[in-house]
Amino acid sequence: MYRNGWGSKPGQECVLAIHLRQQAFEDYLRQAVYSSYHEGLGIERAEWQAQVKQSEVRLQWDPDHDPYGEKLPRRAIQLGLRGSVIKRFAEEDIVLIEEISAYVHEQAEHVHKQQLQHLVLPQESPLHIEDAALRTYLQLDT
């Protein structure tokens, strides 16, 4: 909710919860190219630039945030989809779409009143990825 200001940023007042098939999400991760170059990728910058141009999935790790917007030690993944992948996302990979704007605005009130004990948030758990090469590429064990 940090990124859309609890549904209060202009143009981001409508909040959707999109449920995907887990296999689809993992497929996106396998196709992803980091949005920024760093030496830990193990390839030259020119090769990375070529991959970025061809890729239909961009990957970026950002700090995760607590309800007040303070950074947490864990990271949150952002994926950007385009081309045939976005078509597949829309037509095949979505299991459920929920319009949750009212719920998000209610939860924001608890945050603004500093009443976090009243927050009702989804229970999160880390996604376990068994593919060792993918885990390494995503730097999940660092």
What role is predicted for each listed range?
Residues M1-K9:
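Long, hydrophobic N-terminal alpha-helical segment
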Residues K9-L16, Q22-T142:
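Conserved NAD+-utilizing ADP-ribose enzyme module
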